[in-house]
UniProtKB/Swiss-Prot annotation:
Annotated family: In the N-terminal section; belongs to the TrpC family.
GO annotation, biological process: L-tryptophan biosynthetic process
Keywords: Amino-acid biosynthesis, Aromatic amino acid biosynthesis, Decarboxylase, Isomerase, Lyase, Multifunctional enzyme, Tryptophan biosynthesis
Organism: Escherichia coli (strain K12)
Chain spans, region N-(5'-phosphoribosyl)anthranilate isomerase: 258-453
Function: Bifunctional enzyme that catalyzes two sequential steps of tryptophan biosynthetic pathway. The first reaction is catalyzed by the isomerase, coded by the TrpF domain; the second reaction is catalyzed by the synthase, coded by the TrpC domain.
SUPFAM superfamilies (alphabetical): Ribulose-phoshate binding barrel
GO molecular function, a single term: phosphoribosylanthranilate isomerase activity
Oligomer status and interactors: Monomer.
Domain of life: Bacteria
Signal peptide range in chain numbering: none
Protein name, UniProt field: Tryptophan biosynthesis protein TrpCF
Sequence segments annotated as region (Indole-3-glycerol phosphate synthase): 1-257
């Protein structure tokens, strides 16, 4: 099926190119085209895994992905995380535009990749005129002579080339053609299915001189950690564009869905957010040394745009609902022996957007995670706040996409904890100088360690 879709896209692209040449002839702007000064190849080098983050409004497989598509706003967020930024410029199938390129380039200092079905040198001159620093060349669309001609034009303008392959034959061609950066598309061009094994199979054959980028189907930190053994970097678009909170979406993939719990001071919330946390925990349990009241919680929340989670233990349901509403909490976390009836009643009473998390104590065995209306589980040793870890080998083979791991997590063990495959980690006592007082250096160290791949 997809070969015909791809053939149709390319046929339509040829028509588009001819029309654009009439509307904006090469002679009308070629003298204004300056070589790029942002080096795509260099940007993807270095010890850490590279990320090409993509501005994408729609796609043939998903339709419109982001309704409020604002390239300036997206670039202002991506610039904090990306090695390079990809911009879809295909109009018919991806609702892209060449006009997006200068908008993104003006806001973000990274190299900008023009992502399109490029079949004519004209498109490369056009991309550079609109401030692109690199372009995509797809071996599924181009023969070797076309590729050489187009790559030569790009390099003459000091632009980089992302050479895309999707099977072994194209991978061998990429090597023979001397491609410096090869993108392995995990999407099957025939049926649009995703197979991450494609990266595992093709990457080792590309050799050490080639920078390998894994494309399509990457949407979790666990996938990134595992595939970073095969690829030098990742191109990620749809997994980010589908989320309203773009900062959180990027952090979720680069670092995991991590929470810093037991916040009592605004400066600690800011340090947690600056380090890379998504969630901030506010404890309303009177026996905790980190307990806060509503006024203190409001002070903490005003300091940083974390998604705040209220922590309760066997509280009266009306009290939980009241605090969730007054503070506009993202979630409530239940740390006592709340049963299904309590959870059902709470779900009825809470605003629909407030999630319910349930903390479970892990002893010799892993407790069942079978509650209705529970969105996430926090697995901890004991009742929480003990600073001790349980036997993580119990997590082997478990489906952990809605689980946060807690208990004594710090810079010394966070990587091992992340490798359990949990969606995220819950930090508390090991990032403190004393109970309730977070240490900004310890927080920074934890998140730098999580990003050291």
């Amino acid at each position: 099926m997809m070969q015909t879709v791809l053939a149709k896209i390319v046929a339509d692209k040829a028509i588009w190119v001819e029309a654009r040449k009439q509307q904006q002839p090469l002679a009308s702007f070629q003298n204004e085209v300056q070589p790029s000064t942002r080096h795509f190849y260099d940007a993807l080098q270095g010890a850490r895994t590279a990320f090409i983050l993509e501005c994408k409004k729609a796609s043939p497989s998903k339709g419109v992905i982001r309704d409020d598509f604002d390239p300036a706003r997206i670039a202002a967020i991506y610039k904090h995380y990306a090695s390079a930024i990809s911009v879809l410029t295909d109009e018919k199938y991806f609702q892209g535009s060449f006009n997006f390129l200068p908008i993104v380039s003006q806001i973000a200092p990274q190299p900008i990749l023009c992502k399109d079905f490029i079949i004519d040198p004209y498109q490369i001159y056009l991309a550079r005129y609109y401030q692109a620093d690199a372009c995509l060349l797809m071996l599924s669309v181009l023969d070797d002579d076309q590729y050489r001609q187009l790559a030569a034009v790009a390099h003459s303008l000091e632009m980089g080339v992302l050479t895309e392959v999707s099977n072994e034959e194209e991978q061998e061609r990429a090597i023979a053609l001397g491609a410096k950066v090869v993108g392995i598309n995990n999407r099957d061009l025939r049926d649009l299915s995703i197979d991450l094994n494609r990266t595992r199979e093709l990457a080792p054959k590309l050799g050490h001189n080639v920078t390998v980028i894994s494309e399509s189907g990457i949407n979790t930190y666990a996938q990134v950690r595992e595939l970073s053994h095969f690829a030098n970097g990742f191109l990620i678009g749809s997994a980010l564009m589908a989320h309203d909170d773009l900062h959180a979406a990027v952090r979720r993939v680069l670092l995991g869905e991590n929470k810093v719990c037991g916040l009592t001071r605004g400066q600690d919330a800011k340090a947690a957010y600056d380090a890379g946390a998504i969630y901030g925990g506010l404890i309303f349990v009177a026996t905790s040394p980190r307990c806060v009241n509503v006024e203190q919680a409001q002070e903490v929340m005003a300091a940083a745009p974390l998604q705040y989670v209220g922590v309760f233990r066997n509280h009266d349901i009306a009290d939980v609902v009241d605090k969730a509403k007054v503070l506009s909490l993202a979630a409530v976390q239940l740390h006592g022996n709340e049963e299904q009836l309590y959870i059902d009643t709470l779900r009825e009473a809470l605003p629909a957007h407030v999630a319910i998390w349930k903390a479970l104590s892990v002893g010799e065995t892993l407790p069942a995670r079978e509650f209705q209306h529970v969105d996430k589980y926090v697995l901890d040793n004991g009742q929480g706040g003990s600073g001790q870890r349980f036997d993580w080998s119990l997590l082997n083979g478990q489906s952990l996409g809605n689980v946060l791991l807690a208990g004594g997590l710090g810079a010394d063990n966070c990587v091992e904890a992340a490798q359990t495959g949990c969606a995220g980690l819950d930090f508390n006592s090991a990032v403190e100088s004393q109970p309730g007082i977070k240490d900004a250096r310890l927080l920074a160290s934890v998140f730098q360690t999580l990003r050291a791949y």
